[in-house]
Structure formats: structure tokens, C-alpha cells
């Protein structure tokens, strides 16, 4: 089968207006990070599989292939672990505020509608144990969405320690933990009831309520505190309250106490961003204080934020905030011995471009096809208008 006209599953081309919008968004987001004092970092698209082979990435769907020496390599499925590798192996001084943007690749199932190639931008705050690091990530996420004019968005908070505390207390097998995770993610009331009946504990009331513990932050957190006396869970709830109090002046904040991230490396506050015009989250992040341990014996506190720039481009398009690309208003056809005059004229005339055609006739045909309103001919004898759209006469 000849596939020279096909694209791999989950990939797509971007043309003209969309490609320009995606480029502009990436520029705008990176500029925002820089203004907040973040230092840019770039890592290779190709990494050795060992970077992603820890338990933290057990669910990652990797594009694997062998290099010229027979070593197993992958296309990076996220940016966080490669940045952890850099920080752990280069001896850079902590604490650090890093930013990035680039492509990530995940081998999703066919017909799932997910893009296997995504453009992602984000930040990593490494070496700061303070909750101010989480607050900074969330404020930056909100600031970026406002700068991009994303309408009606909402930030949702969770806490990885809640799910971890429940599963640790229940002492679940690996299979049982996977089943429980799916029940929580699907908010299955019936399934959770059966699970609690089969796995009774001091957290029964809290677990039974988990599928319903999402919504307005203040009300849900107050309700949750009345359902348990467990110190670990109460500590997590108080951290969430602190975050809500700090950032709620900037955006609509909700909570989901059953929020479980796909990557297992999160240890504390986790967050996502949603909007009325988007089916899935386009912003995610949280705290992961043990991530660097797989590269070095020393651990370091870290918080990260990631933005799906492809989703944000789509959101901007749906919201009608993508500005139209400025159209060419003048095509400059020239004789080769008049290139200097033509180039000078093009530099001085906004929204103009040079014609590469050999004849004025071809230049005029091109202008009509692409709705360019005027064509001039530059020669040693001077400048002559050879085409003017009737509406502009």
C-alpha cells in the first residue's frame, strides 16, 4: 500500500490562518512566561525509553523505535520527565523557574478522536516547597487564558493525596486499585457502593460521597470536612482551601475531590482548565515532589503547568478571536534589471510582495486568483500600474 499521500493516525496538517494562529499563540504564551521571570529550556523530541519507564509513566502510550545502535528510544509523551532528567544530570542550581514549548507524542487508540501529536507549552517550578508555587502556576494559567481571550473558562482543583490516602488505607491489590480508579474517574455511584461493601473501612462515608464531591469550591470543601476525621485527607482539604482563597478573585474556581491524573507522579494539589467551548481540559498541572528521584537519590519539590496549545487555537477560533491575516494589497512585478527598485518599493509599501513570474500576464492572473487588488510593473523606464481591481478604481 502506498501511503505517500496519507498521514499517521492522530496527526494533521495546519494551513495558513490556523498555522499562523498556532504560531502566534506559542509566541504569546512564551512571552508571558518570560515576563514572569521563567527561563526557557529545550529538550530533544527523541529520548531513551528509560526516561519514561518508571512507574510514574506506566500508563503512557509511547511511540517506540530503535536507534542506529539498537537502543530503544521514544518520542517524548510529555515534557516534565525530560526536564527532570536535565535538572538532575546537569548540576544546575536550585531553585529554578523553567518554561518550555514543543511537540509531544502519544500513541492513542484509533478512532478515539485524540490527537497523537500535540503542541504543548508550560512551566516547571523546581525547588520551592511553598504553596506559593502552586498559586503561581494557577495564576499564570489564568493569566494566559485571559491574554488569549478564552471565554467562560473554569479552573478545577483536586488533590492527589486524597486518592493516595484512600488506596493506601484500603491496602488494595494492583488490580483492585485499577478498578477503583476507574470507578472514581467515571463517578459510578453504584460501582462505588459495591466497592465499599466489599472493602469496608473508616473512610466509608467519604468514599461513598466521592462521586458527588465536585462543584463550587467553598461548599464542596466544607461538606467534605464533615465526612471524615482522617488527618491526611483533612490536611489536603486545608491546602485546597488556601489555594481557593488565594486565586478565586481571578477566575471561577471549582473542585473535584475525585480528580485522578493519568500520570502517577503527582503528590499534592492538581488542577485542570475547562471552557464552555471545549470538550476536554486544555490546561493541567500540579505538584510532584518525588519526580526527580528516578534520576538521582535526592528529591526536590516541584510544581508544573502544561497547556495544550492546539486546543487553545481551536478555542480561539470558536470564540472568534483569531485575527485575520493581513492580506497582500499590492503585487510588485519587476524586470530583473530593476530588482533594486522593486525591493526598495516592497520594503517601503505595507502589505506588498514581489511577483516571481516571468511575464506581467502571469502576475495579473495570480493576483486575480488570490484576490490581490493591484499589480504594478517596475522596470528601468519606471513604475506602471498594470492591474487594478474594478471595486478599487
Curated annotation (Swiss-Prot):
Q: Which Pfam families match?
A: tRNA-synt_His
Q: Write out the GO biological process terms.
A: histidyl-tRNA aminoacylation; L-histidine biosynthetic process
Disulfide connectivity for this sequence is none
Task: Indicate whether Oxidoreductase appears among the record's keywords.
Answer: no
The cross-references to InterPro entries, in alphabetical order and at most eight, read: aa-tRNA-synth_II/BPL/LPL, HisRS-like_core, HisRS/HisZ, HisZ
* GO cellular component terms given for this protein: cytoplasm
Keywords (alphabetical) are: Amino-acid biosynthesis, Cytoplasm, Histidine biosynthesis
Cell compartment(s), UniProt: Cytoplasm
From the UniProt record, which GO molecular function terms apply? Answer: catalytic activity, acting on a protein; histidine-tRNA ligase activity; transferase activity
Copy the pathway line from the protein's UniProt record: Amino-acid biosynthesis; L-histidine biosynthesis; L-histidine from 5-phospho-alpha-D-ribose 1-diphosphate: step 1/9
Q: What does this protein do?
A: Required for the first step of histidine biosynthesis. May allow the feedback regulation of ATP phosphoribosyltransferase activity by histidine.
> Note on file?
This function is generally fulfilled by the C-terminal part of HisG, which is missing in some bacteria such as this one.
Record family assignment? Belongs to the class-II aminoacyl-tRNA synthetase family. HisZ subfamily.
Assembly mode: Heteromultimer composed of HisG and HisZ subunits.
Protein name listed in UniProt: ATP phosphoribosyltransferase regulatory subunit
Amino acid at each position: 500500500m502506498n501511503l505517500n499521500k496519507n498521514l499517521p493516525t492522530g496527526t494533521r496538517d495546519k494551513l495558513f490562518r490556523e498555522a499562523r494562529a498556532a504560531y502566534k499563540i506559542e509566541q504569546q504564551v512564551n512571552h508571558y512566561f518570560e515576563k514572569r521571570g521563567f527561563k526557557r529550556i529545550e529538550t530533544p523530541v527523541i529520548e531513551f525509553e528509560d526516561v519514561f519507564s518508571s512507574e510514574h509513566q506506566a500508563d503512557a502510550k509511547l511511540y517506540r523505535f530503535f536507534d542506529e545502535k539498537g537502543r530503544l528510544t521514544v518520542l517524548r509523551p510529555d515534557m516534565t520527565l525530560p526536564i527532570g532528567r536535565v535538572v538532575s544530570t546537569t548540576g544546575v542550581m536550585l531553585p529554578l523557574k523553567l518554561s518550555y514549548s514543543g511537540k509531544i507524542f502519544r500513541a492513542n487508540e484509533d478512532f478515539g478522536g485524540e490527537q497523537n501529536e500535540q503542541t504543548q507549552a508550560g512551566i516547571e517550578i523546581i525547588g520551592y516547597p511553598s504553596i506559593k508555587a502552586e498559586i503561581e502556576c494557577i495564576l499564570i494559567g489564568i493569566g494566559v487564558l485571559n491574554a488569549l481571550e478564552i471565554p467562560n473558562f473554569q479552573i478545577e482543583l483536586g488533590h492527589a493525596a486524597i486518592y493516595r490516602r484512600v488506596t493506601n488505607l484500603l491496602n488494595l491489590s494492583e488490580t483492585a486499585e485499577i478498578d477503583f480508579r476507574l470507578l472514581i474517574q467515571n463517578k459510578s455511584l453504584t460501582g462505588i457502593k459495591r466497592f465499599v461493601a466489599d472493602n469496608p473501612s473508616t473512610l466509608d462515608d467519604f468514599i461513598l460521597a466521592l462521586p458527588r464531591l465536585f462543584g463550587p469550591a467553598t461548599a464542596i470543601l466544607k461538606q467534605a470536612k464533615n465526612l471524615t476525621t482522617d488527618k491526611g485527607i483533612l490536611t489536603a482539604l486545608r491546602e485546597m482551601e488556601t489555594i481557593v482563597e488565594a486565586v478565586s478573585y481571578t477566575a471561577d474556581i471549582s473542585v473535584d475531590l475525585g480528580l485522578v491524573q493519568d500520570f502517577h507522579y503527582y503528590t499534592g494539589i492538581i488542577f485542570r482548565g475547562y471552557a464552555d467551548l471545549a470538550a476536554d481540559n486544555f490546561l493541567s498541572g500540579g505538584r510532584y515532589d518525588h519526580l526527580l528521584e528516578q534520576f538521582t537519590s535526592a528529591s526536590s519539590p516541584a510544581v508544573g503547568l502544561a497547556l495544550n496549545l492546539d486546543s487553545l487555537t481551536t478555542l480561539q477560533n470558536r470564540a472568534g478571536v483569531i485575527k485575520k491575516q493581513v492580506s497582500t494589497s499590492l503585487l510588485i512585478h519587476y524586470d530583473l534589471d530593476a530588482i533594486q527598485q522593486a525591493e526598495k518599493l516592497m520594503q517601503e509599501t505595507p502589505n506588498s510582495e514581489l511577483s516571481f513570474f516571468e511575464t506581467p500576464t502571469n502576475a495579473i492572473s495570480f493576483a486575480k486568483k488570490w484576490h490581490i487588488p493591484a499589480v504594478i510593473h517596475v522596470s528601468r523606464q519606471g513604475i506602471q500600474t498594470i492591474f487594478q481591481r474594478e471595486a478599487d478604481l
